[in-house]
Amino acid sequence: VYVSSAHIPEALRPVVLEKWPYTVPAVAQLLRNGLVLRRSLTFLVGDNGSGKSTIVEAIAEGFGLDSQGGRAAALRGRPDPVKTELGKVLRLRTTSAGAAMLSGPRLKKRGFFLRAETAFSMTEQLGGVPGYWAADTSRMSHGEGFTEVFGTMMRNPGFYVLDEPESALSFTTCLQLVALMHQIAQRGAQVVCATHSPILAATPGADIIELGEHGMRRTTWHDLQLVVHWRRYLTDPDIYLRHLLATGDDRHDDVTQ
């Protein structure tokens, strides 16, 4: 691996903890205990607002990756963007391989950050830019564009941070990304991924960390609440839908309303 852990040094700890993002249980736990990255593949899995995107974005920033998505900010001809609140104080412990990569030329850094909020525009803006992909993704569907980006940017060992990459992917293309992540991890890459996808989280050999009101905890794929709920829903959708959808004959009798 390139990064062995993430932590907030004592000297950088915020004085006021009653404000975002430190009110998020997972971030509060990161502040107290840090986060150890034990394997080549790490998935942070949790609901909206659980802090997974906040944490992976700060990890990307800590490795010198563009917080808007991509490689290094200098490749776009602009200065480094202002870091996020967590990114300002988060520090990474790197292995010798990670330290060597960080100390090398920016153009030689083998790393990439896919940020969910900017991913669609990024795929179009960076096509043809040296160091990125040559294909014109504006002529592709979002899913095809994402697949092109992953296949180009994640072909060699490096440090890859992904924020909800499944957002534009079908079931089939999610499986393709699983295969790609598994392959590059076996070749020496490290991937840290925030996801809602039970498909991606099932990638063999991954370390799965579940985020929620409890903070962060390691778990297995079968025990993820995400997986439990998807199984129940696919077995019998009515278990969930009957609590969400209004029922009653008055909704169906008068077709003129």
What are the residue ranges of the model-derived segments?
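Flexible phosphate/Mg2+-sensing switch loops adjacent to catalytic phosphate-binding sites
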Residues: 65-99
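N-terminal pre-Walker A segment at the start of P-loop NTPase domains
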Residues: 1-32
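Phosphate-binding glycine-rich loops of NTP-binding sites
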Residues: 40-74
